[in-house]
């Protein structure tokens, strides 16, 4: 039953990604922007990641206790899930995946770093292109169609942010994206 479940979840994710990309590109997706606490967003996303997450060490580091950003939380949770699921899929069992966030001027920078084998410079140039799949040397009969990171880019762009990938030192990958900062004002409490 495990493989049936895994295959059905793959189809559900594929369908959701295709629908989201289509809605974003044709302008029919309307963002429902609200101020959200980053810690809550991380917690929600981690609760929905791949069942193989237990084979990895996932941690959260926050620079500020009350860090908030303006977002459509449903879509940003989907971005985080896609990136974390990729980290789970393409890193060996026991790898560390760290989610972190910090304030940068009028934005919040969210980072998802892993200590896996990393991503080639050639692959980094195309990771966010629709239908691009990197040759990562890992056999997987359920290889993706190259939609997940393209969708992530479309969602982050729609929020007025930027998404990028870089090397993690000494090895691994870091995906980071920005969202508009929501200032917390205690004067009106």
For the regions a language model picked out, list residue spans one by one.
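Short alpha-helical segment of the dimerization/phosphotransfer core of two-component systems
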Residues: 6-11
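Conserved catalytic submotifs in the C-terminal HATPase_c
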Residues: 32-37, 57-67
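Short conserved segment of the HATPase_c
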Residues: 119-131
